[in-house]
Amino acid sequence: MTLRRRGEKATISIQEHMAIDVCPGPIRPIKQISDYFPRFPRGLPPDAGPRAAAPPDAPARPAVAGAGRRSPSDGAREDDEDVDQLFGAYGSSPGPSPGPSPARPPAKPPEDEPDADGYESDDCTALGTLDFSLLYDQENNALHCTITKAKGLKPMDHNGLADPYVKLHLLPGASKANKLRTKTLRNTLNPTWNETLTYYGITDEDMIRKTLRISVCDEDKFRHNEFIGETRVPLKKLKPNHTKTFSICLEKQLPVDKTEDKSLEERGRILISLKYSSQKQGLLVGIVRCAHLAAMDANGYSDPYVKTYLRPDVDKKSKHKTAVKKKTLNPEFNEEFCYEIKHGDLAKKSLEVTVWDYDIGKSNDFIGGVVLGIHAKGERLKHWFDCLKNKDKRIERWHTLTSELPGAVLSD
């Protein structure tokens, strides 16, 4: 190496350059990405280690004894009929009187799975994104869908813009009542709706087996409306009474399964209230509302009304009828009828409820019906039984309409 005097600038010769380039020093291993970002088992934080095993001398946790069955009350009033005995004599007993259901084992927390939120694809930039939230109101059997906004939608019109709206569809189900839509916003690719659409009559069973399809479309006055993009949310991903917010990328149209059995297609649902009034000495039947009714008219709607009978009807005087609601598949009635009858005789009776489509100049069309009483099963039997066991208490339940009722008169 060349020696330098004090005050001189350090210089490096070509030979020294060669030595530095050829012999850079000891070779060290190149660090990998995993050295900077260590891997951990899914779901564990970096500082989490294996759980410590319980010490062998730790006392065992005592098992919780199951609660014994409640015996029926021995001090019933003499003037009240023994409803359980009557059900045993005239029909099937639904089992123990309604009480707190046995505690279910705690559900395992779902794994953290990536929602549509940070998802990115080619469709994300081509079709746009959609922000919305879903809430299942378990007490009122309602699914609230709030459509907030969309961003970066695909241009559909000649001016480079679109006239977007959002359409909801519950799958499976082909009924027009299963479809809801927002208003249309004109000439925008970044619409803000802040609009809430609600499905009524949604049960816990629906939340397990149904999927909500959300489509963004472009409205065209002179041609068919055009599809922009969609997303689908299995309702089982929602927790009851908990709002879940989504920000997703729209996808191309997915095929709808049309192989589902048409015989299982629902005719609609009806919300009925029952109450035995001690003051009026009679059964109060409330027809509250219907939801998702089958369309019977050419315009895709129905003109529904409801009839009720208390069977057997020897005198043929038990018929009651609501008002007709025009051009709707989700009518609200809020009407109540009273049947004067002794409490003890109700266990021998059945309540027949039928929904009809009103037509001018021709016979009315049967939409669907339901029978509550001693010969019913499931929720229909339980609703009737709960009414008889709880005098002066209004009990409200949703019931699925069927296309056939055993022994019922299906002509108006």
Swiss-Prot record:
GO terms for biological process: calcium ion-regulated exocytosis of neurotransmitter; calcium-dependent activation of synaptic vesicle fusion; positive regulation of calcium ion-dependent exocytosis; positive regulation of insulin secretion; positive regulation of vesicle fusion; protein localization; spontaneous neurotransmitter secretion. Changing R209L: In a patient with amyotrophic lateral sclerosis. GO terms for molecular function: calcium ion binding; calcium-dependent phospholipid binding; syntaxin binding. Keywords: Calcium, Calcium/phospholipid-binding, Cell membrane, Cytoplasm, Membrane, Metal-binding, Phosphoprotein, Repeat. It is a peripheral membrane protein. Residues 38-123 are annotated as: Disordered. The keyword Transferase does not apply. The modification Phosphoserine is found at S411. SUPFAM superfamilies: C2 domain (Calcium/lipid-binding domain, CaLB). Widely expressed with highest levels in brain and kidney. Expressed in pancreatic islet cells (at protein level). Residues 112-123 have a biased composition (Acidic residues). Its main location: cytoplasm. Disulfide bonds: none annotated. Ca(2+) 3 binds at D297, D357, D359, D365. Residues 257-375 are annotated as: Mediates interaction with STXBP3. Ca(2+) 1 binds at D157, D163, D218, D220. PROSITE patterns: C2 (PS50004). Interacts with the SNARE (soluble N-ethylmaleimide-sensitive factor attached protein receptor) complex composed of SNAP25, STX1A and VAMP2; the interaction is calcium-dependent and competitive with SYT1. Interacts with STX4; the interaction is calcium-dependent, increased by insulin and glucose, and mediates vesicle fusion with plasma membrane in pancreatic cells and adipocytes. Interacts with STXBP3; the interaction is direct, occurs at the cell membrane and regulates glucose-stimulated insulin secretion. May interact with UNC13A; the interaction mediates targeting to the plasma membrane. C2 domain 1 is involved in binding calcium and phospholipids. C2 domain 2 may also play a role in the calcium-dependent targeting to membranes. This is Double C2-like domain-containing protein beta.
